[in-house]
């Protein structure tokens, strides 16, 4: 290298790759890549980003502090990161057809926290879906900040249909008069009627917040009705079905709300934004605006339906009888299995999912009576209906093997793992 560095170690600082400087961390990263490349990912909240999104996160933007917002920073030298953040904002607004966007939240939980900081006071009553019915920790669950700082009232699902009963939601809202109603969740397989939620919110004078983290990609393409015409404020993650970097975002059509949101995100809840992640968000939003993304989401939904149907033929009970989205809940009680044991057995077979409570579950959260499955990651690597039929039967084989031997059926699991690895080799990552 032709340079003026007096110190050889400084020259290395700017030129030496990770593999040469930290073999322990590099080995961990390589091992994780091998796991992702050779296993089938069915965790509904996970996805696989494009190489471009990954590259954006590994740029010099990680060096830049940029407290504030484009054109209103507390540091100099922000003209270029201003451009990048402005691109992310404009693309987000176009993608979801809304007036205002804040792309700085580090996560979906941070986005939800910022909305509450902006629009509520400690002790206010909030109403969200209970965790066991398919809600999220940040919607008022007792262990979370939202359940500690606010008077959290929780709605569930109908005992017969296992879907949201809007009459029950209305009755609860009329009884408790919440300041905010939260719609959305982390394990809802059916379409949510945001218009009905807004009717209920208006009746009791509540703010309607929609957390669309799981279904943002579906909403972006029109595969699920948008909450933006109905909600006062919408939060989302930027990964999951949106297939971007891990992060959060807040959207609204109300100027007075975005002013409060912006102040709540910074300086209220966060300091400097992660500009390298915001750059990756901009890249992902650009990808989602393309026609290929709609094709992708259509495949995600179709693959989920195919997977659910195969599992039903294998004796699995799918909560609500199917899915309209990217995910499904599998009730394992008919097979006499627990979610934690099923998760472990499937992972031994090369299929990753997560144990998950089902509505009215009597098991503890670390045991559960079900597993949650999703198709976004598998679809991202190219799996179609035929592949998901195979996957459904492999899951059925592993679960049936577990019924035969509750401690694990090594013969079945090893056979399935070999077949999984062979399938994954046909759809390699980042080649």
Curated annotation (Swiss-Prot):
Binding site for (6S)-5,6,7,8-tetrahydrofolate: 131, 135-137, 256
Superkingdom of this protein's organism: Bacteria
Keywords for the protein's UniProt record, in alphabetical order: Amino-acid biosynthesis, Cytoplasm, One-carbon metabolism, Pyridoxal phosphate, Transferase
SUPFAM superfamilies, alphabetized: PLP-dependent transferases (SSF53383)
EC number: 2.1.2.1
GO biological process: glycine biosynthetic process from serine; tetrahydrofolate interconversion
Cofactor: pyridoxal 5'-phosphate
Pathway recorded for this protein: One-carbon metabolism; tetrahydrofolate interconversion; Amino-acid biosynthesis; glycine biosynthesis; glycine from L-serine: step 1/1
GO cellular component terms, A-Z: cytosol
Keyword Phosphoprotein: no
Catalytic activity: (6R)-5,10-methylene-5,6,7,8-tetrahydrofolate + glycine + H2O = (6S)-5,6,7,8-tetrahydrofolate + L-serine
GO molecular function: glycine hydroxymethyltransferase activity; pyridoxal phosphate binding
Keyword Chloroplast carried by entry: no
Site (Plays an important role in substrate specificity): 239
Residues bearing PTM N6-(pyridoxal phosphate)lysine: 240
Compartments where found: Cytoplasm
PANTHER family, per the entry: SERINE HYDROXYMETHYLTRANSFERASE, SERINE HYDROXYMETHYLTRANSFERASE 1
Family classification: Belongs to the SHMT family.
Oligomer and partners: Homodimer.
Biological function: Catalyzes the reversible interconversion of serine and glycine with tetrahydrofolate (THF) serving as the one-carbon carrier. This reaction serves as the major source of one-carbon groups required for the biosynthesis of purines, thymidylate, methionine, and other important biomolecules. Also exhibits THF-independent aldolase activity toward beta-hydroxyamino acids, producing glycine and aldehydes, via a retro-aldol mechanism.
UniProt protein name: Serine hydroxymethyltransferase 2
Gene source species: Vibrio vulnificus (strain YJ016)
